[in-house]
A protein has these predicted regions:
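Metal-dependent nuclease catalytic cores that hydrolyze phosphodiester bonds in DNA/RNA
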Residues: 1-133, 140-142, 146-153, 157
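Membrane-associated lipid acylation/remodeling enzymes share a hydrophobic transmembrane-juxtamembrane segment
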Residues: 155-165
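Residue-level detection of beta-strand scaffold positions
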Residues: 133-134, 163
Length: 165
């Protein structure tokens, strides 16, 4: 029998509105004229060339609303991690005096990147050397466990490249 009263679930309808707004926000962002250093761990050189050239994504192959939500959660978690580290006695600088991120550029500006922060001091009993870069990564529990077991380089090679850049 056909059910003409079937509707998507409430949370799915709300999420579709959120995703559409995130898609619209992303569409308004100015396109990069450089290759982001966070992409250096991507193995497919052709994909990197297309990205650098500004080729459009294949239909349905861009960042979905779900992925954009995950990115936003990562930014919020980064803010919390910075706060917690500072509370624990770390001197962590995550913005320049003008408010922008610390960044770098190579290859006449064709390659650019940013760091999440720079740590210049920590509790002495940790025995750390300074300065050191701070890179904050978030991931689902199953990915975290895989990284703990096999290492970031094996489990998340793109993350490993980002942290090493």
């Amino acid at each position: 029998m056909l059910d003409f009263n079937q509707h998507s679930k409430f949370h799915e309808r709300v999420t579709s509105h959120i995703d559409a707004s995130l898609d619209a926000e992303r569409a308004e962002q100015k396109a990069r004229t450089y290759l982001g250093a966070s992409r250096l761990g991507v193995e497919c050189e052709r994909a990197l060339q297309y990205e650098y050239a500004g080729a459009p994504n294949d239909l349905g192959r861009g960042f979905s609303g779900r992925i954009l939500r995950i990115f936003e959660v990562g930014h919020v978690m980064e803010e919390l991690a910075v706060r917690w580290l500072r509370m624990a006695g770390f001197e962590l600088h995550n913005q320049k005096p003008d408010g922008g991120q610390f960044g770098f550029s190579a290859a006449a500006g064709r390659l650019q990147g940013h760091v999440d922060g720079i740590i210049t001091a920590a509790p002495p009993e940790l025995g750390l050397s300074f300065p050191m870069l701070f890179e904050c990564k978030t991931m689902a529990d199953k990915h975290w466990k895989a990284c703990a077991k096999s290492g970031v380089a094996v489990t998340k090679p793109v993350y490993a490249a980002q942290m090493a850049t």
